[in-house]
Curated annotation (Swiss-Prot):
Membrane-related topology note: Peripheral membrane protein
Residues involved in ATP binding: G46, E47, N48, G49, A50, G51, K52, S53
Main location: membrane
Subunit structure and binding partners: The complex is composed of an ATP-binding protein (RbsA), two transmembrane proteins (RbsC) and a solute-binding protein (RbsB).
Name under which the protein is recorded: Ribose import ATP-binding protein RbsA
Family matches, as SMART domains: AAA
Molecular function per GO: ABC-type D-ribose transporter activity; ATP binding; ATP hydrolysis activity
Function: Part of the ABC transporter complex RbsABC involved in ribose import. Responsible for energy coupling to the transport system.
Gene3D superfamilies: P-loop containing nucleotide triphosphate hydrolases
Record's GO cellular component terms: plasma membrane
Amino acid sequence: MLKLAPTPSDDPVLRLTGITKTFPGVKALNAVSLELYPGEVTALIGENGAGKSTIVKVLTGIYRADGGEITVDGEPVNFTSAEDATAAGITAIHQETVLFDELSVAENIFIGHAPRGRFGLIDTSTMIARAQEILDRIDAPLRATTPLKDLGIANKHLVAIARALSVDARVVIMDEPTAALSQKEIEELYELVDRLKAEGRAILFISHKFDEVFRIADRYAVFRDGEHVGAGLMADVNEGDLVQLMVGRAVDQIFPERDHAKGAEVLRVEGYAHPTEFDDISLTLHAGEILGFYGLVGAGRSELMQAIFGITKPSAGTIQIAGEARTIGSPAQAIENGIVYVPEDRGQQGAVLGLPIFQNVTLPSLSQTSRGGFLKLAAEFALARDYTERLELRAAALDQDVGNLSGGNQQKVVIAKWLATKPRVIILDEPTKGIDIGSKAAVHAFMAELAAEGLAVIMVSSEIPEILGMSDRVIVMREGLIAAELDRADLSPEVLVRHAAGIGPKVHENEMEERP
């Protein structure tokens, strides 16, 4: 039984009651309630499409709620613009910070509300001094006069936080703030959040990562399908409780049970090399097998997959499909030979965001949906429906544009697109990156189903639990070379990290030749 949080001694600085927001054909928010308290972090948790982004836009004045009430310090407010929300002390720091590279740090901090002197002109010296004061207060190692374009992602996040403090925000919304940060930068962000709490600010922290939520949050609120389904103290719940609230059912295993049997060899790569990305890569892949690839950023994993798929050409090496030598010089040749690739960047490389779902799914399979040179709309819909239903795609209709889907559902569309070609080998590059835990479970279950049907799967992942939970074998890459090839029985987090970080030796040429 999940416990509800006791009423705190302080009243909430922000309270939402019965908030409703409807778009054509979709009820994005259905009588949602939420409370944020001073000096506390509330984690907002939910699957993609649960309504988190919509509630943020309502809170920041981008959307107007169709019904319900918002109060600040107990007084009803009506936000008709972002300026109204800012004036009420509410500001948001988004996953992709909205800043201007051509302006200085100070100009970005005070854009829209710069101090002004005589004749209404911007008082530049005062603006720089105030900006530097805020930066120093949050221990940001930045100068207010520095051009923003000279900063990295982590420091741009600090500028966004400084901008929130420049309007004396009492409520700070952080939407997936760690998505592009290193572990060191994440720890520094945690320290900054602790300081904001100590100043009495209320923080709404949106994250898919449970380790972050349990590290930083005092309270939680869970949304599911546009409804508020639970809230309470973090101290009273565990990960399983939150998952159950998110998906509406108990999820005992994010990684499905498999028998790990494998069939005949489907793919063999020998001596693949690239002038700058990888060297002397050899591997085999069998029907029904999930081969995991693990490594640190820059290890060459994605570059190797792009070469196998024909996006880039190797400088050396051979490839065999089912024992026969093949030439893979382009993605078209790879597809002809039964190899497909789901890229890490689904938005830029995997999906056409401006096209509807059914056209995305059927794009590489037009021979199945046309007759006499003419496309058959019914055949397109039937093919798209078959694969999207198997992947439990959540969408209003198959003619909905992919760009309007959540990240997890976009990923399902890309996977469906390539499965519709009936491949022998599917390469999944970071298949669950940036998607919620419910969508992850669905993708994992479908991967297991594909392997059970005899499809050969290569899974590139930077998530150790995913590597451990899904792989039959794992190849660890380091600096463009194979550092280790490990059977399932030999896998552990320590072993993976040791080989990826270079604590263990790389595989030598004679060891490569000993592989079956």
